[in-house]
Amino acid sequence: MSASSLLDKQCDHFSTKIVDLIMVDKADELDRRVAAAFSEREASRERRISQISGECNAGLACKRLADGRFPEISAGQRVAVLSAYIYVGEEILRWILEPEASVRTRVSGLVAIDLAPSCMDISRAQLLQTMNLLSGKRCAPSDLSHFVAISISETARSRTLQMAPYEEGSLKSVTGFTVIIEEAVPFDMVAYGRNLMLKASAGSFPTIDLLYDYRLFLDKCSDSGRIGFFPEDVPRPKVAVIGAGISGLVVASELLHAGVDDVTIYEAGDRVGGKLWSHAFKDAPGVVAEMGAMRFPPAASCLFFFLERYGLSSMRPFPNPGTVDTDLVYEGCRYMWKAGQQPPKLFHRVYSGWHAFLKDGFLEGDIVLASPDAITEALKSGDIRRAHDSWQIWLNRFGRESFSSAIERIFLGTHPPGGETWSFPHDWDLFKLMGIGSGGFGPVFESGFTEILRLVINGYEENQRMCSEGISELPRRIASQVVNGVSVSQRIRHVQVRAIEKEKTKIKIRLKSGISELYDKVVVTSGLANIQLRHCLTCDTTIFRAPVNQAVDNSHMTGSSKLFLLTERKFWFDHMLPSCVLMDGFAKAVYCLDYEPQDPNGKGLVLISYTWEDDSHKLLAVPDKKERLCLLRDAISKSFPVFAQHLVPACADYDQNVVQHDWLTDENAGGRFKLNRRGEDFYSEELFFQALDTTNDTGVYLAGCSCSFTGGWVEGAIQTACNAVCAIIHNCGGILAKDNPLKHPWKRYNYRNRN
């Protein structure tokens, strides 16, 4: 039976027609009018049933009532009728209501659920997650733009899921009913209209562990140009900032704008920027090798605030796997992955499974954990309670899982996302190679699962960009700004700080030269290894509480190595070779980078080796960059000789046109970035909130990405810099801008509560 015939059949049996609510755009009005439509339908049906049963000796068993057109009647007995909603896209809705005669496609297996389109407790992403799990299909957000309200018999085939969380951690039951539009089934269409459930809004949004939008705070402060200020009668503090990375420079700059004139920055190295380090080549000034941070997602909204402030808006996509032509090398065989398409067949199961996980979350028994996409949408739509409760459930259930054990639990269990159970070790190894969007994650498989998941939820794996002018241009421009006649860079002293100690009400800085100086406040951004070993801040509880000391001493810093090669030409364009190569051998990840797209004859840049952890540690045995390059080139040539033959430095100059760096042996870094092991999220909490702890203020404040929830990302460095600045202004009698992080009513998580 066609949809139009079904609609006609319904109209023949009772006078109430399906109600058009397309123009209703307010949730409360939609709720009221849908309820009215159901009430009118129920009254009309009751009159019709009474009429037919009264005319027939068989009563409720009358054949006219048992033909499947009345949801209230089953086997001659009255049954309950439930309200449910079919969610469809605009095209399918139009097909259901006004089909053309030529359309014969069967619309079957549609699922109706008991969640109303006016429900504000459920987001579109959660609806999508629920529909995918109940229907077993892959719905897109556009497939849920409209609804058809139906009355359906309680005898209809159904399945119930428990959505976690709901209202401060409780569960919400969601029941789905399978319906077939073209058959006489026990349901009636009552009304149709637009889905008004919450959907994500544009603009910045808070990170999942903080639920506070630092970008919004910075935007609000833009008009005045400062985070806070000091009244004329309040003395300004004398402040030392340890480290001239992005965090230290933001601290110094914001303090100067707030009116703190006596600011000194101590930097142990010979450059500014810390891990924002762009190496420029003599033979190609417009080409830069990003030795530290190199991928910048728009979701890192604080970073983009400062990029825009200092006129660095030129960005282009980073050539991540699958976004450009990519070769995947597995067990000596090459598999080509065309840009924007599905990966090779060998990788379909892990690729589809991971992307299903992002949309559908994880079904454990009959309890559904919110999908990463649903949590992100809750953040974007301002549904902070939903985001908090959803993330707390993940922390409770997976906080003690490593990335490795969580992948095993999710994809090798009874309800794997995508419907296909992964095999071990085959799919396991494929996933290690392919990764989650930005390359293979095999080397960090033993890090905490929630440490990786938060990056996904925060949007840091999406739409990653590279900075055309080199990211170190940002710290350079911050350092070059002049405040009260003196540039920030003039306040930098390139000398190593050996110790930071309390001396009565002051903080004493002891320098490598033997000189000591006293300050009112000190902000330490120099990294965890220096805080523990050089500054000796964790020897006792004079400066920091014991839990903070423990976090500094025990947080895991990741080793990372990079080797860049400047080539005579952009050979990958000349010879139609892939811009990205992922390998399961020694080389791991190769990226071809074009910093001068306007010049097709310009120099090329290849990141021939970007490795983490054990893969990086092995390279430390080969410190000579020419020897290391030769080993990498030989490894690549075994499976991809056509590509490897072009890996020769421009002008055969290995000294100038090959650069490498090992962050683990960098004496001023002690590792590339903090990456928590399983069960160690509470370390990040201790480090991040240290500066905001007004009850334990000693005058020394931590900042930097390693003291945040997002180690290795510029966002965490800026967030903690804001914390330190606010703490100093507030604790020294200054006045902060409204809605600042110090006065924010933080909704904290329980990182130690494990089920």
Swiss-Prot record:
Pathway: Plant hormone metabolism; auxin biosynthesis. Its EC number is 1.13.12.3. Binds 1 FMN per subunit. Keywords: Auxin biosynthesis, Crown gall tumor, Flavoprotein, FMN, Monooxygenase, Oxidoreductase, Plasmid. Substrate binds at R295. Its cofactor is FMN. Gene3D superfamilies: 1.10.405.40, 3.90.660.10, FAD/NAD(P)-binding domain. Signal peptide: none annotated. InterPro entries: Amino_oxidase, FAD/NAD-bd_sf, Flavin_monoamine_oxidase, Glycosidase, Trp_2-mOase. It holds the Pfam family RolB_RolC. GO terms for biological process: auxin biosynthetic process. FMN binds at S247, E267, K275, R295. It catalyses: L-tryptophan + O2 = indole-3-acetamide + CO2 + H2O. It comes from the Bacteria. Transmembrane segments: none annotated. GO terms for molecular function: tryptophan 2-monooxygenase activity. Belongs to the tryptophan 2-monooxygenase family. This is Tryptophan 2-monooxygenase.
